[in-house]
Amino acid sequence: RSWILCLILSLFTTLPAISQSKVRHHTSLSDTLLKLKEVTIYSNRMQKKMSPVQILSGKELEKLNVYSVADALRYFSGVQIKDYGGIGGLKTVNIRSMGSHHVGVFYDGIELGNAQNGVVDLGRFSLDNMEVISLYNGQKSAIFQPAKDYSSASAIYMQTRKPLFKGEKKNNLNIGVKGGSFSTINPSLLWEHRFNERISSSISTEYMYTSGRYKFTYAKKDGYDTTAVRQNGDVRMLRLENAFFGKVPKGEWKAKAYLYNSERGYPGAAVREEPGKFRHQDRQWDTNLFVQGSFQNYFKPWYSLLANGKYAYDYLHYLSDPRLDVTTMYVDNHYRQQEIYASAAHLFTIYPWWSMSLSNDFQWNALRADLIDFVYPTRNTILTSAATSFDFNRLMLQASLLYTHVDDNTRTKGANAGTKNKYTPSVIATWQPLTKLPLNVRAFYKKVFRMPTLNDLYYTFIGNKDLKPEYTTQYDVGITFSHTWNNHWLKSLDLQIDGYYNEVDDKIIAMPTSNQFRWTMINLGHVEIRGLDAAIRGEWGFGKVELSTLFNYTYQKAQDFTDPTSEWYGGQIPYIPWHGGSIILNGSYQTWSCNYSFIYTGERYEAVANIPENYAQPWYTHDFSLSKTFQWEKTRIRVTAEINNIFNQQYEVVQCYPMPGTSFKIKLNVML
């Protein structure tokens, strides 16, 4: 087809785009090195961010009493995690109440795709090999990036460790094992090797097993308290990553192979009226494999190139047996997804204060399933972004325009959703009013849309090929303050406050038909979100004692204005609390360190109807850890003890999906 030829030409012959000037632009290599340095450098980086961003990196991630990326994201403001029941349950993220489908998830710079249902289960990504987790509202503030990076309302970037060697050392080895409550065992291995000054590699692997069995209590319908044990929450998981890193004159490259294999049970809802009646024996098997590579080079002072490529294969087997759970129908389905992705981003630096960029992406997705009358859809997506950036020292401006072309095809004639062509803009600005005061005022506007997923369009009996895209419009105004002090007990202080207003239109939802066993997908809904995010971070020093503090707060009023005739018109949308916050306190003294963390989620409703029957009480948890590091010649040994949910808070993130109470864990790491 002609569009294929146009794509190839645009990917490899389009002249470069712009990013920020070379002084302000950071390669992934420099990012890694900076994030490993002291907090003074980290603070200086923070004040240059034009878009609202929250970062957890290095030792902060290491000290958190959490296993997965989803659990770590709970400490960011403006984030709601939907957790369907503890260990084995699905974990998805909702940022600023716009929905999980509007969150882009990137792994080492390339997006993790799921064309089938549009969401990524962040519970399957552990922190074992993670160096940095960043959350951006809107988009990253650098314009030298793939077009994909412009296509989401918000984005999560996970960056894994990059090998760093001291002196002439050629190998780093980190052997770890964790064990604790719920029969949890989690061994891991990280081996980093330096071939020469230009090429290095890393192998990271881990295995985890947990029974997922934990006690929980709640009040029954008759008012009596009862205790039950969470069933069918076991997980067996294996992750294996192999990465290579290389340097070339004026640039670098990296390549990675990733394999994830798991079997898990889905514990299902706990029915209050008859606890323990339904056994919930649903099982899921997953295999996720991808290989990806990236090349970045500064060919000329005025031109740089960033090229990415990826192939991914995902297999999912879901089994539900009504003989074990009478609330379900028999399901024994197998799904297979394939994805091919290629990207070329060009950066032109016209003047030190003016740069431009042009990025072209192509993505192909295919979905196969053993469903009756399945149409076997494929999707071709072309994204082209044009962006420009102006840096007048105290005033910085950015603007971008994203073009999206989506073409679906199916084996069944006339069953496809046709072709979509959309343009979506964004504008970002930041201004420093006073030269000597490290205070910045920032603002952004962004309009973006999401295509209906392949399930939304083509799932047998449920899909609707006539669905329209779902649009979001974002407005944000905020301030940032960042400063460091020398020879002072307060070493650094970072503050950011953002107020925002979002709209979601043509929201895609499931609605029942005349047959109660068949639902269909429709466009319905207008949601308005008004909110405030605030974060303050401090680094303190009292002699040999070092202390870091992080406070986050979120206020959100997310109203449903879908149906003016509804009694619940203008009510708070389900599962969005008005207030939420978190606290992280880290302390260290010589070879000892401790960490305390607190999470609070305020009152909310569990359904559209804002009535007492749907009211959910606030919940909060306290976690604490203590670690000691031993040095024996060239070997370091770190022992960590953790306690989660210290006061055994009984709570539910999602109605009828109880979370674990108090739990314990011991970690041992040997670093050679």
Show the residue positions of the predicted features.
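Flexible loop and strand-edge segments within Gram-negative outer membrane beta-barrel domains
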Residues: K22-R24, G212-F216, T227-R239, F245-L305, ...
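N-terminal periplasmic "start-of-domain" segments of outer-membrane beta-barrel proteins
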Residues: L33-L64
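Extracytoplasmic beta-strand/coil segments of soluble accessory domains associated
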Residues: A70, R74-E111
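A beta-strand signature from Gram-negative outer-membrane beta-barrel systems
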Residues: L127-N174
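Membrane-embedded beta-barrel scaffold of Gram-negative outer-membrane proteins
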Residues: W302-S320, L434, V441-F444, E470-R530, ...
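Structural signature of Gram-negative outer-membrane beta-barrels, strongest in the C-terminal barrel
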Residues: Y351-D361, N365-N502
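Gram-negative outer-membrane beta-barrel transporters
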Residues: M356-S357, R394, S492-E503, I522-Y605, ...
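C-terminal beta-signal and adjacent terminal beta-strands/loops
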Residues: D506, Y600-A607, Y615-A616, D623-L672
